[in-house]
């Protein structure tokens, strides 16, 4: 899926990923390709992103929103 991580400073990450693991205000979730559309608030956490090449990336999240849209598009918006 195509993931964008956007902060007040601009685009922090943009690329193709296999999975995204985040902590929402309702609990921890992992999103894979072809996930159903979703919008949820994020809790303070470390987002774990696995890129298509297998590289694991970690992003510190204080708060924000996670959106999974149609067509394997996902965005994390952080403040």
Each language-model region and where it sits:
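Compact, glycine-rich, soluble single-domain proteins
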Residues: 2-79
